[in-house]
Curated annotation (Swiss-Prot):
CDD domains: MobA (cd02503). The gene is mobA. One of its GO terms (biological process) is Mo-molybdopterin cofactor biosynthetic process. It comes from Methanosarcina mazei (strain ATCC BAA-159 / DSM 3647 / Goe1 / Go1 / JCM 11833 / OCM 88). Its cofactor is Mg(2+). GO terms for molecular function: GTP binding; metal ion binding; molybdenum cofactor guanylyltransferase activity. This is Probable molybdenum cofactor guanylyltransferase. It is found in: Cytoplasm. Its EC number is 2.7.7.77. It comes from the Archaea.
Length: 224
């Protein structure tokens, strides 16, 4: 670690990450996507390794105790890291409920949020989003077509009352409370490409084909 990096880490505040692992993997036969293996590591293990390069705690947002028990063995690989679980209070409320539960559990003002099936989350991008979010309500990647990456973003606890209001209106989209917050920073994907040209940080695994493509891409990289 060079002196510049060390100085930067000493100055930064405590950071949390919320991993939304509560999805049922319906498009993959109801499997726990976070436990799928890729290059001898589960997706969750790979994700945690990347996150702990830039955060101090990780909160795993899960459906219930049954899912917690399935994921728990992965935590044995991180004995010196702070990893906790939180649970949805509302059924079938989607990822927005996972974000709400995670923000309530988080020890920091700002938390990075991502899905549990994203094996290539880039620590440099996470670091960038935390920096952009500092002093603001949120920092969210934005594409040129005005599409967003709300499940790869940093949110402050100021989002909590807006989530409650969204639920009261019957809205479960993650963007519903986002657009009600007053001070959201949108980070252009063109800026993110400077750190991650292929934008692999946004890759998630929804189908068997996604997993096969990911494995095929890795083989091409090593010339197999």
């Amino acid at each position: 670690m060079n002196k510049k990096t060390e100085s930067k880490e000493q100055k930064r505040s405590f950071r949390s990450a919320i991993v939304l692992a509560g999805g049922r993997g319906r498009r993959m036969g109801m499997v726990e996507k976070a436990l799928l293996e890729f290059e001898r590591k589960t997706i969750l293990e790979r994700l945690l390794e990347n996150l702990f390069r830039v955060v101090d705690e990780v909160i795993l947002s899960v459906r219930d105790n049954s899912q917690k028990e399935k994921l728990f063995p992965v935590l044995d690989k991180f004995p010196d890291r702070e990893i906790r679980f939180c649970f949805d209070s509302l059924e079938d409320a989607g990822p927005l409920e996972g974000i709400r539960a995670g923000l309530l559990e988080s020890r920091s003002e700002n938390s990075f949020v991502c899905a549990g099936d994203m094996p290539f989350v880039n620590p440099e991008i996470v670091d960038l989003l935390f920096e952009k979010a500092s002093g603001h309500d949120a920092a969210i990647p934005r594409w040129e077509e005005r599409m967003f990456e709300p499940l790869h973003a940093v949110y402050s606890k100021k989002m909590l009352p807006e989530i409650e209001k969204a639920f009261e209106r019957g809205k479960h989209s993650v963007l519903a409370p986002v657009f009600q917050m007053q001070d959201v920073v949108f980070v252009e994907v063109s800026e993110i490409r400077e750190f991650d040209p292929e934008l692999r940080t946004f890759v998630n695994i929804n189908t068997v084909e996604d997993l096969e493509n990911m494995i095929g891409h890795a083989k091409e990289k090593v010339g197999l």
